[in-house]
Amino acid sequence: MANILVVDDEKDILEQFPSIINRWGHNVFTASNGFDALQIFEKHDVDLVVTDIRMPDMDGLQLLQKIQDIDKQCPVLILTGYPSDDSAIEAMHSGADDYLVKPVNFDELKLRIEKSLERKNRMKSIPFLKGLNWALLISIPFWLILGIILAKLLR
């Protein structure tokens, strides 16, 4: 179960998305602008953000940058009702995990959310795996020396 923040200035999105995403087993927070979204993001343990790209005052790309300043590991999915190659490229270059066009196909949204959360969980395990590698590298000389000593003792 993940905590997902949905940010959009469209009331329909803020009403539809939570009920659908809740059915998938996730908790949903909503915000109608970037400033409220940042407050929620800082107050709660948010695992993933779905945000509109065009919003008044703070657009989705500005919100993306601020979220990345706080937590570089948090996936952000960008929504737009005005698709263009340039906006998709800009969003991806800015660090968005994915880019979806409105009206959103909910099967596609579910898939993108699941893939982004899986990627985030894999990234969380990297420091542990690096530590495990170091532990193995450090322990190999110890076991070699111990093996040599035991071999000499058993002769």
Where are these regions (language model features)?
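Active-site residues of response regulator receiver
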Residues: 8, 52, 80
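Two-component/phosphorelay signaling modules centered on CheY-like receiver
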Residues: 11-29
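Acidic catalytic/metal-coordinating carboxylates
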Residues: 32-36, 59-62, 83
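Short amphipathic alpha-helix used as the core "switch/output" element in two-component signaling
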Residues: 39, 61-73
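Active-site beta3 strand of CheY-like receiver
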Residues: 44-50
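Receiver (REC) domain active-site loop signature in two-component systems and cognate sites
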Residues: 55
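C-terminal output helix
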Residues: 104-113
